[in-house]
């Protein structure tokens, strides 16, 4: 008889809530019984219980873990200040975890989660939903089959709204960096330039983000990534740019064409099937990339849970694993490290503390 999985979710109403619906991703999944939610807020807890159909609800997530012994747990809050404690508690209780992004705000905490999961034989998946979508997975197949020739460059762009710069880079950029790695593999080294009002970054520019996702700095970030595969990667984000709602996405440039992916789920996917970009050429234009499914980004949560179960049963890494999350975070924090050091940053980064925290501490001693 096939194993059935007992699932639960941890939320924190008013302090990161339930993220982007990580608690409601289990509905209709074969082999899963959703049994419990935990939330210190009474009203939020009851609402989550009703939405998920959970039999039990707890104010204390540790009590839930001890009493219910779930096999799968969603760590839902958007805020990263609780992720290390919650994820490690789940792992130590014997559960596999689906965690909201960013998984951690610093590399040391991410390393702790990766190492603890390995030691306990547990899997951790992270809510970078796009890479679970059939549309994005099939796009990777097309790239590997040479649809645009040899992939040479990936240009990624943040949303560039009021959070543009450093906050955009951690809040939404984490999806882009994870996707860049999904297409191009590991980064060998990187460089970056972070500025405020056109001047070089100073220690006094370091502040907190709108939500607790670690320290941020800069209203303009431009970064370069040298992938081991030979692909050159670029990221840019500036604060309060015109058309910010349409900027988020990337262009994948190949030797024989270019693919434009706009939005988190790549719902606006176009191809320029020509080796040289010639806007004036009447016979050369952008075309829809046909034949790929178009699923909403939220579908990725359900697919991530299905993949997590398969990863457990096949003893493999999830598509978007804790290791992937740490590597994406390195691409973010490496921009600060490059700005502060004034040079290239080798990957993986040698120093695992947050570069902005370490910089401020050095300035204060």
Q: What do these predicted ranges mean?
A:
Residues 293-305:
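Active-site loop of classical SDR/Rossmann-like NAD(P)-dependent oxidoreductases
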Residues 175-270, 302-318, 333-335, 350-365:
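Contiguous beta-strand/loop segments that form the cofactor/metal-binding neighborhood of enzyme cores
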Residues 13-19, 123, 130-215, 342:
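Predominantly a Rossmann-like dinucleotide-binding segment in NAD(P)-dependent oxidoreductases
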Residues 36, 56, 72, 153:
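Short, Asp-centered acidic motifs that coordinate Mg2+ and/or phosphate
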Residues 1-4, 9-10, 72-74, 111, ...:
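C-terminal helix-rich "cap/oligomerization" subdomain common to oxidoreductases
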Residues 67, 72, 78-79, 83-132:
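Beta-strand-loop-alpha-helix segment that lines the small-molecule cofactor/substrate pocket
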Residues 54-60:
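Conserved SAM-binding strand-loop segment of SAM-dependent methyltransferases
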